[in-house]
Amino acid sequence: LMPLLQMPHPHNDGGYAVEDFDTVDPALGTNKDLENLTRELRKAGISLCLDFVMNHTASTHRWAMAAKAGDPWFQAYYHLYDDRTIPDQYEQTVPQVFPNTAPGNFTWCEEMHKWVLTTFHDYQWDLNYANPAVFVDMTKSILHLANLGVEVFRIDAVPYIWKQLGTTCRNLPQVHTIVRMLRMVLECVCPAVILKGEVVMAPKELAAYFGTPEKPECHMLYNVSTMVNLWGALASRDTRLLKAQLDALHALPDNCWFVNYLRCHDDIGWGLDEAVEKRLSIDPQKHKEYLYHFYEGNFPGSWAKGELYNYDPATGDARSCGTTASLCGIEQALEKDDKTALDYAVKRDLLLHTAMAFLQGFPMLNCGDEIAQLNGWDYKNDPDRVEDSRNLHRSKFNWEDAKQRTRKGTLQNQLWQGMEQLRQMRADPCFAPDAWV
């Protein structure tokens, strides 16, 4: 599930600005509701995975409020500076996450008369893990949620949690120490709980977050690289990058388990392996620009309908937004009432899901993909959501379309039956973890 802990309203980055790590947001229910949900899911053989935001709190979290009030204990929970001397030094080496909508990495707090490190949005204050109290309190919250029945934690923005001057503040060695410490605590207290790392970084950085067989860190990671290469291969009709990436994946040790997916709540960041691209005589920048324009629908012959996210004209960088169905061409084909185009779009959709389903690891189906849910362009009419194009693929689930999944001949039925066939094939013993191939 997406973040459901107490958050400020309306500005909460989709729940990734947390006011209270121990309490379900009142708009969604209570802690008792969460406990009842995990119990019912477990009866059905389902483990609940919950987002846990490690890097920051909301600026309205009680720790932040105490810091604003001048409490030195809680001011030490954050990175605070009286003037721009150190922040300016950080800015020389630390990239910006949202250069257009939230430029810079620091925010001025008038109540404290201090600068606050805010990697993401100005209302998300980065925690200071150099303070042991931060690790202790965050670990307590994870254990509290585990006691409510959460069995898998998707630890968010892990590569960012350690800050050091003169670096990019990404993927630093101390990050791995902290994740290792968290894994050790969980193995002692609740050994069945799983850590799933959200590491949206260059391919060369990914494997380190598994740790080693002797010193494990995350149990699983999102397979960002394969996801990006699948979309890249579909648009370019060139599988060389995908093959190179899969070859590298299969060479990883046995302790490396990935969650394979096509779409999620986030954008598609075109983090392809530039060294491999150059070896294949592919211009990395031009290739990236081609891909994000293609999936924007802004390239001759493109079947996709999507939007750019976080476009930076200075670097030419951008990411892509849209649902699987819309990016595969289903939305455009329906608009044009083109049956041939629709048939091809459905085949693209099922092709990607087939590739994803039979990779080593755990296939993850994004909610709505099973009924070909389209982009939700109505977000542009919501003043609280219009600034973030990721809301294009964050629509409410379309229950009316879901009813069509059992009606033979409907678009929804085509996708539903295709997914069911993949599920049955994946359940075959030949795909068991201990199967010999």
Label every PLM stretch briefly.
Residues L1-V437:
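Active-site and adjacent substrate-binding regions of carbohydrate-active enzymes
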